[in-house]
C-alpha cells in the first residue's frame, strides 16, 4: 500500500505491472506457447509431513509434463505447511489441463500486488510511562512473534536492537536466510529472529536476469523504505532522541516493543514495487509453519476489489488457512479513497485497517505582506524565505520573470504531474513554489527545498492578496509542531472506503488507526537522511499499528481466536478522538466519519483488552458464509479439507447470520431477522442491557433485550428484526447496537440501505 516518502522529489507511481519470467514450449504444429507462473491450489494439506506433500506436488507435475526432470525444473514453490499447493511454470493449456485434476481446487495465474508511525501509541492511550494498562499488562508483547510480509528490512536500524530481550521462544521454527549484504549471523538477533526472501516466481536469483536495479538487494535487506517502517511500527524496540530531519523528535517504539519480528520479503523494486502472489502465498505458508503469532500484510491489489476466494485474490486464501490455525491476519484497507467502494482486502476473516490522522501536525507558516499568516500542510524544514510573490498558470509560464521570487500556482493534477514544477523551479531560479491542490493527507517533508503544498482555500486567499496588491510579498518560515486537542482527528482522504461491493453484507474496513505522518525506522540510503527514521503515510502505516495492538492482546489473551480479537477491537473502538471530539472524514468535502470510513471506529487498545463480550466465529461459520455466498461445495471441501464431501445446508444460510461484530443490510425491502451470538469474557455474573440507535427511517427490534450470564451460561444469542419506513430506494443510513453492563459498552455498527427497486442505482 502507498506510503508517503519524506523527500519532496520522490513520488510513488502506483500501477499494476505484471512482469513475468517468460519461457516457451513447443506445442502441436510446431508453434511456441508461452509459459508463465501459475498457482495450483489444493486446499488443506493431507499430510503433516512436508516432504510427502512436496512429493505429491512433483508427482502431479510429472504426470502432466512427462518427466521428473521437467517437473523439477517447472516447480517454483511448494506450499506444504499451512495448506497444500504449488507454483509452477506452465503454459495456459497445461494450466487448463491440470485444473481438471480431481484434487485441484483452482489454478490461477501469478498476479501482482502493491505496497500500500513517536506519538502514535501515546495518542491511543498506550504510554510506556503509565504503569497500568494493556502495554504493561502484556509485558509490552514479550515473546509474541509478529510476521511481516513486505519489502524486506534494514537490519542495522536501532529499532531492531535486542537489548533486554531473553532467549528466542522455543516454539520458533523459522530461519534467517543469507543473501546479498545480509549475513544471518550478524544481522539477525533476539529481536529480528526471522528474515526470508521470495523471488522465484519473478526472476532468477541474479541481477543480470532479473531486470531489477543495482540498488535492490537479492536478500531480505530492502532498498526502498516500506518494510522497515512497517516492521518497526508493529514491534520496534525503544530508540531515544530520533526524528525525521527534526520532525517528530522523541523516543520511538513499536506497538509491542518487546515482541519478536520475522520478516518475509515478497516485494521487489522493479518498475514499481512488485509483489507476486505466488511468493506471497509461499511466505504465508512458511510463516504459519515458522510459528508466528500474527501476520501483518500492508499489500493489496488495485481496484476493482476481488471476492474472498477469487482466482486473483490469493491473500484471502492464505489468510483463511492462517486464521483456521488460530493466527490472525491484518491487512491494509488500501489507498484508493476517498471514493465509495474503494476498500481492499475484504474477506471477513481478515482484519482490515483504515487510516486516520494523529493529534499532531507540522504546518509551515506563510506570512503575507498584509501580516496574514496561513498554515501550509507541507512541513518545510529550512531557512526562512522572504521574497516577492507572483502567480503562474502552469510550469510552462514559469519564465525568467520568476527568478528570485516565490511562485504560486494551482493544479488539479496528480503528485507526479507536480514534479514538473520542481524542474522549472530550478531552471528559472525561483526561490520557492507554492502549489495549491486538492486537500491531501499525504505529507511530504520539504527539507531545504522549498516546495510548499496548500489546499485550494489557502491558495485562493494567497491569490486574492496577490491580485489586489501592487508589490505582494511573502515569508516562508520553518515548520512548527502542533499537538493535542486543537488538531482534529480525521480519516485520511486516501484511506479506502466502504461499502464492500463484493460482499456487501460484510462491513469493511473493520477499524481505523493512525496512518498519517507516522515516524518509524527507514532505510537511510534511500531516504537521504543519516538518522534512518522517516515520516510516512498510508494504510500501510495504520495496519502495523493495529498489528502491534493485536500482539499485546494475544499476550494477555492467548486463548482468544482471531475472530474474538477482531471483535474486541471493533466493539470497543471509538467514534470520537481521545479528547472526545468527533472524528471527521476527509475527502472532496469534509463530513463526520461513518462506518464506511472507519468501521467500528478508532481503536481503543486498553478497552479492547477488556471488551466484556465478544462475537466469535469458527471455521465452520466461515464455511457456512461461503455456502451463503454461493461458492461451489467442491471448492469449500478442498479449502477446508473435510473428511467427507462438504454439503451446504438446505436452504442455504443467510449471509446476514455470519456472527460479525457489525450488521450491514444492503438490500432492505421487507422485514429481515438475523441472529448474533456473544460470549462473555468479563465478570462471570453479568447482566447486559440493550441500547439501540437505529439508522434514519429504520426500525430495530431485539429479542431478548437483556442478557444474563453466570457460571453456567457463558454464550447467549439474540435476534434482530430490521424493517424500513422508507417508500423508495435510500442511501445507507447508520446506527449502532450496544450491550452494556454499566462498565462495559459492547457496540456494533449498523448500516442499512432500503432497496425497493433492486439493481436500480438512484
Curated annotation (Swiss-Prot):
Q: Name one GO cellular component term.
A: extracellular region
What superkingdom heads the lineage?
Answer: Eukaryota
- UniProt keyword terms in alphabetical order: Autocatalytic cleavage, Glycoprotein, Hydrolase, Protease, Secreted, Serine protease, Signal, Zymogen
Per the UniProt entry, the glycosylated residues are 206, 241, 371
EC supergroup of this enzyme? hydrolase
Q: Where in the cell is it found?
A: Secreted
Give the matching PROSITE patterns: SUBTILASE, SUBTILASE_HIS, SUBTILASE_SER
Q: Where is the active site?
A: 150, 226, 540
| Protein name stated in the entry | Subtilisin-like protease SBT3.11
Q: Tell me the organism.
A: Arabidopsis thaliana (Mouse-ear cress)
Amino acid at each position: 500500500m502507498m506510503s508517503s516518502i519524506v523527500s519532496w522529489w520522490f513520488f510513488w507511481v502506483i500501477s499494476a505491472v505484471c512482469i513475468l519470467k517468460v519461457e516457451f514450449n513447443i506445442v502441436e504444429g510446431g508453434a511456441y506457447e508461452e509459459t508463465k507462473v501459475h498457482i495450483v491450489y489444493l486446499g488443506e494439506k493431507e499430510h503433516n509431513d512436508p516432504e510427502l506433500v512436496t512429493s505429491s506436488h512433483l508427482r502431479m507435475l510429472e504426470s502432466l509434463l512427462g518427466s521428473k526432470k521437467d517437473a523439477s525444473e517447472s516447480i517454483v514453490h511448494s506450499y506444504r505447511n499451512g495448506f497444500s499447493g504449488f507454483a509452477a511454470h506452465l503454459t495456459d493449456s497445461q494450466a487448463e489441463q491440470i485444473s481438471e485434476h480431481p484434487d485441484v481446487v483452482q489454478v490461477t495465474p501469478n498476479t501482482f500486488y502493491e505496497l500500500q508511525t513517536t506519538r502514535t501509541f501515546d495518542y491511543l492511550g498506550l504510554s510506556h510511562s503509565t504503569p497500568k494498562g494493556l502495554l504493561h499488562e502484556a509485558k509490552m508483547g514479550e515473546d509474541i512473534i509478529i510476521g511481516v510480509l513486505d519489502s524486506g528490512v534494514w537490519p542495522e536500524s536501532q529499532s531492531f536492537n535486542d537489548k533486554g530481550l531473553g532467549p528466542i521462544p522455543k516454539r520458533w521454527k523459522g530461519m534467517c536466510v543469507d543473501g546479498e549484504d545480509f549475513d544471518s549471523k550478524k544481522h539477525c538477533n533476539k529481536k529480528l529472529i526471522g528474515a526470508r526472501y521470495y523471488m522465484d516466481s519473478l526472476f532468477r536469483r541474479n541481477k543480470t536476469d532479473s531486470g531489477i536495479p543495482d540498488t535492490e538487494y537479492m536478500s531480505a535487506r530492502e532498498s526502498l523504505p516500506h518494510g522497515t517502517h512497517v516492521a518497526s511500527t508493529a514491534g520496534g524496540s525503544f530508540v531515544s532522541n530520533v526524528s525525521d530531519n527534526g520532525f517528530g523528535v522523541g523516543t520511538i517504539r513499536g506497538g509491542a516493543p518487546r515482541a519478536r519480528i520475522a520478516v518475509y520479503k515478497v516485494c521487489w523494486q522493479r518498475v514499481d514495487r512488485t509483489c507476486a502472489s505466488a511468493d506471497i502465498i509461499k511466505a504465508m505458508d512458511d510463516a504459519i509453519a515458522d510459528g508466528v503469532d500474527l501476520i501483518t500484510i500492508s499489500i493489496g491489489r488495485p481496484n476493482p476489489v476481488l471476492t474472498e476466494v477469487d482466482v486473483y485474490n490469493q491473500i484471502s486464501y492464505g489468510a483463511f488457512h492462517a486464521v483456521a490455525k488460530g493466527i490472525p491476519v491484518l491487512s491494509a484497507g488500501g489507498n484508493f479513497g476517498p471514493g465509495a467502494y474503494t476498500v481492499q482486502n475484504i474477506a471477513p476473516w481478515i482484519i482490515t485497517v483504515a487510516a486516520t490522522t494523529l493529534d499532531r501536525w507540522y504546518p509551515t507558516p506563510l506570512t503575507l505582506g498584509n501580516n496574514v499568516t496561513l498554515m501550509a500542510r507541507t512541513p518545510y524544514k529550512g531557512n526562512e524565505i522572504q521574497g516577492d510573490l507572483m502567480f503562474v498558470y502552469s510550469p510552462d509560464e514559469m519564465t525568467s520573470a520568476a527568478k528570485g521570487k516565490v511562485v504560486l500556482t494551482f493544479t488539479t493534477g496528480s503528485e507526479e504531474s507536480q514534479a514538473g514544477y520542481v524542474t522549472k523551479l530550478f531552471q528559472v531560479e525561483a526561490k520557492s513554489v507554492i502549489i495549491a491542490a486538492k486537500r491531501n493527507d499525504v505529507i511530504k517533508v520539504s527539507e531545504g527545498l522549498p516546495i510548499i503544498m496548500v489546499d485550494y482555500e489557502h491558495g485562493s486567499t494567497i491569490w486574492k492578496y496577490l491580485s489586489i496588491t501592487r508589490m505582494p510579498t511573502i515569508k516562508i518560515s520553518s515548520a512548527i509542531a502542533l499537538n493535542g486537542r486543537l488538531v482534529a482527528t480525521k480519516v485520511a482522504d486516501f484511506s479506502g472506503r466502504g461499502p464492500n461491493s463484493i460482499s456487501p453484507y460484510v462491513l469493511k474496513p473493520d477499524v481505523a488507526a493512525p496512518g498519517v505522518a507516522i515516524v518509524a525506522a527507514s532505510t537511510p540510503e534511500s531516504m537521504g537522511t543519516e538518522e534512518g527514521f522517516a515520516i510516512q503515510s498510508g494504510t500501510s502505516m495504520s495496519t502495523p499499528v493495529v498489528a502491534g495492538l493485536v500482539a499485546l492482546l494475544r499476550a494477555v489473551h492467548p486463548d482468544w481466536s482471531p475472530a474474538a480479537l477482531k471483535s474486541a477491537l471493533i466493539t470497543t473502538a471509538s467514534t470520537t478522538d481521545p479528547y472526545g471530539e468527533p472524528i471527521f472524514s476527509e475527502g472532496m468535502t469534509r463530513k463526520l466519519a461513518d462506518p464506511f470510513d472507519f468501521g467500528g471506529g478508532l481503536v481503543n487498545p486498553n478497552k479492547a483488552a477488556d471488551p466484556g463480550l465478544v462475537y466469535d466465529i469458527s471455521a465452520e461459520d466461515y464455511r457456512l458464509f461461503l455456502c451463503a455466498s454461493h461458492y461451489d461445495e467442491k471448492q469449500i471441501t478442498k479449502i477446508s479439507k473435510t473428511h467427507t464431501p462438504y454439503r451446504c445446508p438446505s436452504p442455504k444460510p443467510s449471509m446476514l447470520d455470519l456472527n460479525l461484530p457489525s450488521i450491514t443490510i444492503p438490500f432492505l425491502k421487507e422485514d429481515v431477522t438475523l441472529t448474533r451470538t456473544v460470549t462473555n469474557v468479563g465478570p462471570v455474573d453479568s447482566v447486559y442491557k440493550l441500547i439501540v440507535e437505529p439508522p434514519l427511517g429504520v426500525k430495530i427490534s431485539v429479542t431478548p433485550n437483556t442478557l444474563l450470564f453466570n457460571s453456567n451460561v457463558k454464550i447467549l444469542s439474540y435476534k434482530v428484526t430490521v424493517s424500513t419506513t422508507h417508500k423508495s430506494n435510500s442511501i445507507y443510513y447508520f446506527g449502532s447496537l450496544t450491550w452494556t453492563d454499566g462498565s462495559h459498552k459492547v457496540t456494533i455498527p449498523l448500516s442499512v440501505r432500503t432497496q425497493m427497486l433492486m439493481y436500480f442505482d438512484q
